[in-house]
Amino acid sequence: MSLLEDLQWRYAAKKMNGEQIPQEKLDYILEAARLAPSSSGLQPYKVFVISNRELLAKIKDVAWGQSQVIDCSHLLVFAAWDGYSNERVSEVFNYTMDERGLPHSTMDDYKNNILGLYEPLGKEWQADHAAKQSYISFAMAIAAAAEQKV
């Protein structure tokens, strides 16, 4: 099937069917979200997978009582950063350099350029920007879920 056919298959479920999503399909969806492009490569969000029934019930209370929240197999929560701090940006760069086996200082100039660009824009702009980046990842997860017929 093509991407367009997968997306045409996709729909907003109003009632869940009670089936558990197989772990391999969930992993595929999460990997698509992880591989999503983001501005400056920072991925300024975290994706939480929630399947604990008690926690889902609490989330339902603040999600306008939507039954899908409690009836789903897994709930993915995309939590965007509330700002671009030196600590957060450094953590991303350090992780990347560790994965590549390079010294942390390898991309210091680029990291400092990013911080110099984002910091003066203020916390409200930063939070809005991070939220927009999380939407891109969310869209990739939706496309992957459609491909997996979830």
Question: What is each of the regions a protein language model found here?
Answer:
Residues M1-V150:
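Acidic, surface-exposed loops and disordered segments
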